[in-house]
Amino acid sequence: MSITENESQEMLGRSELNDIEAILSITNTDVDAIQHIVKDNADAIFTWDYSLSRPALRKLYEKAKVGQWNATTDLPWETVVDEEKQVSMDQAALSSGLTANHYEGTVMDKWGDKEWTAFGIEQRRWSLSQFMHGEQGALICTAKIVETVPWYDAKLYASTQVVDEARHVEVFARYLDEKLGGSYQINAHLRMLLDDIVNDSRWDMTYLGMQIMVEGLALAAFGNMQQMTTEPLLKKLLRYVMSDEARHVAFGVLSLQEVYKDMSDLEIKERQEFAYEASVRMRDRFMSQEVWERMGVNPRDVVPLILRDPTREVFQQMLFAKIVPNCKKLGLLDRNDSWLRRRYEEMGVIQFENAEDTGEEYVKYELGETLADVQH
């Protein structure tokens, strides 16, 4: 059963999933702002129980301690990055399947190699900028988890993730500044999602929004770019970040599995709806409207074509390769008459449900392991 127009309006702010006008109406109006303030509405919790009663979290904590790396000394920052040459080599990945032939009859139909190369550079700059902003969101949310989670084991692990996230913001900011010559402001859809995650007072919603949804999509997106790029610094940077990121997603799976099994159907329905809203917002941000605007193209002319592009559709579906099996592991897909399963069927991403969940898979991402057996 599909959700009604009223339900969609209440959750997404629009009656139809692919309402282009509604998607594009959400823009970042304060592009010159340096700071953004969000109320976090949560209590800090001390615990006087210092027993380590969750072996899976203890194992994760130990792996985090030995898996640390130095962003300054462990990456080859001396690498010279030729933007135009790199874009030409990585064009398929950079344009995410968008080709000139697909835009026959539009302004892009007249684009030559120069314009498509410029688009590729801007697309990479935009993608890495959103990674950077998302990592700062993770930095803030994980610091919140340290404060709000009631378990000693979880506080210990979350503290290591705070350090990881600081390192991730550092490497993306440095790469954008030194190798790509600048960055983009945060996409409005991503900012709204981060605001909702920080604003919610319930500690498990911070986990769900950040560890499962944002970090889960990031892990898949990093894997896609790491697999496609031939640029050695970026390839190594992403590989190192992924080794941390997999632990972060596993942290969410291992923690929430314990919590959700005892929740009522009403409580689970709230989590299902939040997961769906987060999924749609993350999908919407990959329309790259800021890139099209910078290239002098009206996004309203191109977004309908993006939504119909089969190669773009495959790319966007792959971004959910981690989220869907993890939601299944948490029991979110099939509670309440399979409500979330039906939403993911409508989004065309349910095919990933039987992939290995990150709570089991994370060890395959450790530095020194090959990624050949990991599904991106």
Predicted segments, located by residue:
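Amphipathic, well-ordered alpha-helical segments in soluble domains
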Residues: 134-141, 168, 214-221, 248
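Carboxylate/His-rich catalytic cores and anion/metal-binding grooves
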Residues: 151-181
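Helix-loop elements that line ligand-binding/catalytic pockets
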Residues: 237, 249-259, 276
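A structural feature that tracks compact, well-ordered secondary-structure segments
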Residues: 139-145, 159-160, 219-225, 237-240, ...
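Short amphipathic alpha-helical segments with heptad-repeat character
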Residues: 129-132, 136, 159-162, 166, ...
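Active-site-proximal alpha-helical scaffolds that flank and shape metal-associated catalytic sites
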Residues: 174-246, 270-281
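Terminal targeting/low-complexity segments that flank the catalytic cores of oxidoreductases
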Residues: 1-141, 147-155, 178, 182-185, ...
